[in-house]
Amino acid sequence: MATQKQEKSVIWDWLTTVDHKKIAIMYLIAGTLFFVKAGVMALFMRIQLMYPEMNFLSGQTFNEFITMHGTIMLFLAATPLLFAFMNYVIPLQIGARDVAFPFVNALGFWIFFFGGLLLSLSWFFGGGPDAGWTAYVPLSSRDYGGLGIDFYVLGLQVSGIGTLISAINFLVTIVNMRAPGMTMMRLPLFVWTSFISSTLILFAFTPLAAGLALLMLDRLFEAQYFIPSMGGNVVLWQHIFWIFGHPEVYILVLPAFGIISEVIPAFSRKRLFGYTAMVFATMIIAFLGFMVWAHHMFTVGMGPVANSIFAVATMTIAVPTGIKIFNWLFTMWGGKITFNTAMLFASSFVPTFVLGGVTGVMLAMAPVDYLYHDTYFVVAHFHYIIVGGIVLSLFAGLFYWYPKMFGHMLNETLGKLFFWVFYIGFHLTFFVQHLLGLMGMPRRVYTYLGDQGLDAFNFISTIGTFFMSAGVILLVINVIYSAFKGERVTVADPWDARTLEWATPTPVPEYNFAQTPQVRSLDPLFYEKIHGDGTMKPAEPVTDIHMPNGSILPFIMSIGLFFAGFGLIMLNMDNPIINPWIVAIGGLALTFGCMFVRSIKEDHGYHIPAEQVKADLAELKKGGN
Amino acid sequence: MKLWKTASRFLPLSFLTLFLTGCLGEENLTALDPKGPQAQWIYDNMILSIIVMALVSIVVFAIFFIILAKYRRKPGDDEIPKQVHGNTALEITWTVIPIILLVILAVPTITGTFMFADKDPDPEVGDNTVYIKVTGHQFWWQFDYENEGFTAGQDVYIPVGEKVIFELHAQDVLHSFWVPALGGKIDTVPGITNHMWLEADEPGVFKGKCAELCGPSHALMDFKLIALERDEYDAWVEGMSAEVEEPTETLANQGRQVFEENSCIGCHAVGGTGTAAGPAFTNFGEREVIAGYLENNDENLEAWIRDPQSLKQGNVMPAYPDMSEEDMEALIAYLRSLKVME
Ligand code: HEM
Ligand SMILES: [Cu+2]
């Protein structure tokens, strides 16, 4: 067993890392790239809709863009960006040295990444998938959908495996790796929501995997699950999809709630109002999230009994969500609030999300939904939830945790400018879309005729998109500017915050905590500031710290799955250069080979000797940290 | 003063008021100007839900603006505010009030769902209730009046003031049948038969749309619903069911030959029931638009016949780029002569 890590090149270091903090940063970068890609598509779609009968994108291209925009935003942008924060913050907030399975953590990232890459490759093979992110059959079936759909099916299948195993890792980490005294009812809310969200992934991504497998069998091997003329059922796909798809929204929005529940208390200098109610409200939301999937299907003809049941069930979600909203408001009430960029995003989230929520209740009224369904009203509603909820909280989290992750602050002036430009642009874009929907504009339309009363609002909506894009450009400028000129952070706790991640030094050492902290309360760091000397009490003496070795296997295994998926897609290509089965089976063999190597190779990791940890601690003392 | 300053930072939100200024969109497309009992019911309940939801939003916004105004941290103020755990009474309040509000919305939700699902004949007209079989195709609509024995394409005619029952089918992929000014939408699903009913309060032309993504030209899958007084409607039905007469004009007669020789007739029936391949042409001369969206003039008609793909990407009609000028002229004259109303 080696006691010292060898020196490695930077690239090799990142390809083989199993450190949750580095994996978090990789998620952040990959998620951002996909976010920008899907954002540019949104911009193009809005330009196409700026004037009636524009000829900027064709109907086919537009459909490819809506599909890729929706799919990428949900699976390859929002999910990994949240995973970035979850990966970075969860172990720190619960006082752990790493996640439960560091190797699996790296594997999860690489599988997600190569799955996303596989999906994106569709552009080079005759066009993206074009049946919407919901991929409803028959449009996505062999008879009507092109090769792009195969990339959708297998790309999501692969990247879904990554998401699934990462979620399992989070679950085990939160259950097993908590520091002494960190009881479940002392978990920070971000950890709680991540925990529940990971549970949802467990139960939602499995039906998705099954559904995608069935669709793959239909498309590649002429099975007939979804082909009505052969006894299949079209609506079956919709049920399977939404049993996954509805919880998916909660998978994304619950950790977003968690971020808000961290940022608002920190900058209001108050503990979270009604902590217990918040935890149980989260659980109830998650549970109900599974019960209401068919509210996406009020118009497929399920009949009045089913429609009524799902309508009423859907409405009940408003109750626990309302509890959360008021608890956030009353956390701020009576506080001493600092409105920096993170807090601007977090506090503006509350009323914005309410606007998205109230239209949700409106949509739940099934007979009225016969009007709203598949119109721009729905587009407005879910972007109020997704952009007004998830994206605003991602930005809040970014500004909040940035100094811990990168060792310098983001510029506040640029940050606030970014907030205002983006926030105004957001409302400009999406508010008028409610009206467009009621005025008769269906969604997923690549053009509309003039003089139907739709021109003005479409124009306004597109202008809003320009503002949002300008906002994101300001953020990019901010990141670059701050990397060079930003205020360096070496203190542990630049925000005067409350939770454990701010008890670690900046930059965070690879072992996170030299000594595992003893947790004595909710908001442990704040507790020590009031009742102790402001630092965490150690729960153990300084000892050798056991660390896992890096490994290239996760990377290679993911490439294997990538080729397995690609090989299957080649089955539907006209003139594959090589036999598809060779690629598919070769890819799987690579993956399973790596699994075999991993199983038989002894790898006990390495130790950081106690002396070195002590030296680090002494160094920190000198720095006044 | 201070409050106003804070509030003015949120001025962009005040375009909320746009909602109240009555930008309603085009008459007979928008659902904000309902023209039938079903649309009216939807509209009323939408307003009800907006009122309830506006109440909730106003409460949240009020609390939020008070917070913005009152609880800013002053520079140099390092005092730590009181750490409250929560407040059971308050938390129960904001659990119970939403439940009451939801019950208010749940009741019409259930009654409305059952009302719209009712497919019994109109009690006023009994056996004469109009039943129309709708079939969605990529990217056009077929309307079979099965009891009367004829087919119409793209435009559907109904009598005013009667509940009309639609039976919904899909030929290829999912579509969704929607006339915003008259009511809600229901999907047409391959392999499944759905029903809905609509009623128009007054005569007029109402725009219809396909609301479910169905391929590259989904955006152009428009149709028209034409509501006529009962006697006019009966006249139209009679015209549609009558034997097709030879065109009287020679040019049009010639055009009919072109129509047959180029096997247009293989897909587009004239008179009687249609094949499923293309819209029926029995009353083509009375249509306002071609292909659901193009103004019905000679130029557009010729452009369409020569190259339908460029006007409606992904549709299945073959192109006739090489048809001679004479044939084209005759063909158009023939199509113009296809009328059933005087
Ligand atoms: C930057 C701001 C954004 C703009 C301007 C924008 C714009 C659009 C547009 C024009 C559409 C097509 C609407 C239609 O169905 O006709 C769309 C659909 C969609 N968007 Fe966005 N979007 C934005 C951000 C996001 C984000 C952040 C997410 C998720 C994380 C998201 C998720 C979706 C989804 C799921 C769809 C539906 C795709 C489908 O119909 O298959 N969008 N968006
Ligand atoms: Cu359609």
UniProtKB/Swiss-Prot annotation, chain A:
Molecular function (Gene Ontology), one example: metal ion binding
Topological relation to the membrane, as annotated: Multi-pass membrane protein
SUPFAM superfamilies linked to this entry: Cytochrome c oxidase subunit I-like
Binding-site residues, Cu cation: H246, Y250, H295, H296
Induction and repression of expression: Elevated expression at high pH.
GO biological process: electron transport coupled proton transport; oxidative phosphorylation; respiratory electron transport chain
Binding residues for Fe(II)-heme a: H69, H383
Segments crossing the lipid bilayer: 23-43, 72-92, 99-119, 151-171, 195-215, 240-260, 272-292, 309-329, 343-363, 382-402, 417-437, 460-480, 551-571, 577-597
Cell compartments where the protein resides: Cell membrane
Enzyme class: translocase
Keyword match Transmembrane helix: yes
Cross-link (1'-histidyl-3'-tyrosine (His-Tyr)): H246-Y250
Binding-site residues, heme a3: H381
Pathway where this protein functions: Energy metabolism; oxidative phosphorylation
EC number: 7.1.1.9
This protein's UniProt keywords: Cell membrane, Copper, Electron transport, Heme, Iron, Membrane, Metal-binding, Respiratory chain, Translocase, Transmembrane, Transmembrane helix, Transport
The UniProt record lists the keyword Acyltransferase: no
Listed GO CC annotations: plasma membrane
The reaction(s) this protein catalyses: 4 Fe(II)-[cytochrome c] + O2 + 8 H(+)(in) = 4 Fe(III)-[cytochrome c] + 2 H2O + 4 H(+)(out)
Main localization category: membrane
CDD domains, A to Z: Ubiquinol_Oxidase_I
NCBIfam families according to UniProt: CtaD_CoxA
Family (UniProt): Belongs to the heme-copper respiratory oxidase family.
Function recorded in the entry: Cytochrome c oxidase is the component of the respiratory chain that catalyzes the reduction of oxygen to water. Subunits 1-3 form the functional core of the enzyme complex. CO I is the catalytic subunit of the enzyme. Electrons originating in cytochrome c are transferred via the copper A center of subunit 2 and heme A of subunit 1 to the bimetallic center formed by heme A3 and copper B.
Protein name: Cytochrome c oxidase subunit 1
UniProt source species: Alkalihalophilus pseudofirmus (strain ATCC BAA-2126 / JCM 17055 / OF4)
Gene name for this UniProt entry: ctaD
Curated annotation (Swiss-Prot), chain B:
Lineage top rank: taxon: Bacteria
Lipidated sites in chain (N-palmitoyl cysteine): C23
Subcellular location as annotated: Cell membrane
Residues given in the record as heme c binding sites: C264, C267, H268, M317
Record-linked SUPFAM superfamilies: Cupredoxins, Cytochrome c, Cytochrome c oxidase subunit II-like, transmembrane region
Cytoplasmic side: 70-89
Membrane topology of this protein: Multi-pass membrane protein
Record's keyword terms, sorted: Cell membrane, Copper, Electron transport, Heme, Iron, Lipoprotein, Membrane, Metal-binding, Palmitate, Respiratory chain, Signal, Translocase, Transmembrane, Transmembrane helix, Transport
Record topological domains on the Extracellular side: 23-50, 109-342
Coiled-coil residue windows: none
Function, in words: Subunits I and II form the functional core of the enzyme complex. Electrons originating in cytochrome c are transferred via heme a and Cu(A) to the binuclear center formed by heme a3 and Cu(B).
Name of this chain's protein: Cytochrome c oxidase subunit 2
Species this protein is from: Alkalihalophilus pseudofirmus (strain ATCC BAA-2126 / JCM 17055 / OF4) (Bacillus pseudofirmus)
